[in-house]
Amino acid sequence: MRNRFDRQLEELNEMLIHMGELCETAIEEATGALEGHDIARAKAVITADSEIDQMEKEIENLCLKLLLQQQPVARDLRRISASLKMITDMERIGDQTADIADIVIATKSTEEKNLKDINRMAEATVKMVRDSVSAYVQKDLELARSVMAADDEVDDLFDLVKGDLVKFISDHKGNAGDEAIDLIMIAKYLERIGDHATNIAEWVIFSITGNHPG
């Protein structure tokens, strides 16, 4: 019985890794579409969001099956419960990459000089998502805590982007100002993705220690 349960937990780990990879790719593709104003790439991000949604359903079903059929002990119960929370945040990450893609499709162009720090935000959030899922699979408390610390960097970058773009808006009128507002929205979505990665890390800590740091 325990061997079967362990195999199912391993399956859960693999599914979470795959869902995390989908989220990482979605962030990279959405910001890549922004940089090149690639409409086809942006549309592919929106399509890929449905795969993330489907992964959420499949993982949720497996977690519920484990809870109902296996009667897990406290440690395993925490891991399964944390997984259910984590996939909610990953699904929202998928939604926010689709929101970024929607903005790319709706806009005519972007001010390239404003994209450097947005790209840095994207790189930081991809790493946060990757590290949060790795921390869960490896039961790595320090890695989870490093994700939480990294959120400060993303927040600082958002403040930097917003400040630069607000100044740009005050100095320009018309379409250029509208495009700057779109970039602020994209930066805000990336900041929220960082928040979701932090939530995942907090649930990892709960799964290991039994205490939620939030």
Feature roles, as predicted:
Residues 1-214:
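Cytosolic, long alpha-helical scaffolding segments
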